[in-house]
Amino acid sequence: MTNPIYLILADFFDRYIGEPPEKIHPVVFIGKLICFFENVFKSTNSVNKTRDLLFGFLNVILVLAIVFFMTYEIEQIINSISNSYIKISIYSIILSFSIGHKSLIEFSKAPIKFIVNNDLEGAKKSVQCIVSRNTSELDKKHILSASIESASENITDSIIAPLIYAAIFGLPGAFLYRAVNTFDAMIGYKSEKYQYYGKTAAYLDDILNFIPSRIAGMLLIISAPFYGGNIKSAIYGYFNEGNKTPSPNSGYTMATLANSLNMELEKIGYYKLGKGEITIEKALNSLKAVDYSVLLFLIIYTVLLM
């Protein structure tokens, strides 16, 4: 198991310093790798089930192999450093590149700020950056809902899951997870072009998020009193509404947070989670929930390894 200090410092560096420039960001590099092999394997938009399933699978395997080899070698080099302070610093900084804590908070808070300033059009444009739905017709309630949904879902994708895989498998685990997550974001959605080509990526993302999403939901339950939530309501949401979204995983954090803060999250035509009015205070408390759930995870992991 990975030393807890690496995870603690990695989250600290990401939360308070942020991500590196795009030119040197590992996740951006992974995205370019995905695009490179996609251009090799899928040069046209035409759909062929057998071909697309095979080449989509090969795209995933090749990118993951490259990511594993590179991160494994980097980890070996870091572990060979004799000075423990330098080793811990370098390892933690690189690991922080697999986490999106600061960006999650900033992107989720942006639409809320526009709502506070009564700028509905600005809020629509802002929330469009973090959700895939059409935001042009959304009202204040549904803009806040979309922002909170994104924050609660990405507790898993951007923070808890990479930390879990880093804890178990080190740098390779964290970045292999982020590679799969990036695959899902780029080609895993259900469009005509990617309906077969993206299947491997989508299934693998669902598998890797299965346990982390449920752990993240439990963290939101336990930390509820610290962000203004209700434990009993959070438990209800987790067990009764966690499976009410099209995704097999994202509903557990969204439903837990919605019920914990007594608010209704709705993606029109897809799901409704929780009950109650969404207020600015509840939206901001949702962002506090992100911080407290991550802090709780780090505390529990550290205690378990003591």
UniProtKB/Swiss-Prot annotation:
Disulfide bonds: none annotated. It is found in: Cell membrane. One of its GO terms (molecular function) is ABC-type vitamin B12 transporter activity. The chain crosses the membrane at residues 54-74, 88-108, 155-175, 215-235, 286-306. Keywords: Cell membrane, Cobalamin biosynthesis, Membrane, Transmembrane, Transmembrane helix. Pathway: Cofactor biosynthesis; adenosylcobalamin biosynthesis. GO terms for biological process: cobalamin biosynthetic process. Its main location: membrane. Signal peptide: none annotated. It is a multi-pass membrane protein. GO terms for cellular component: plasma membrane. NCBIfam families: cobal_cbiB (TIGR00380). PANTHER family: COBALAMIN BIOSYNTHESIS PROTEIN CBIB. Converts cobyric acid to cobinamide by the addition of aminopropanol on the F carboxylic group. Belongs to the CobD/CbiB family. This is Probable cobalamin biosynthesis protein CobD. It comes from Methanococcus maripaludis (strain C7 / ATCC BAA-1331).
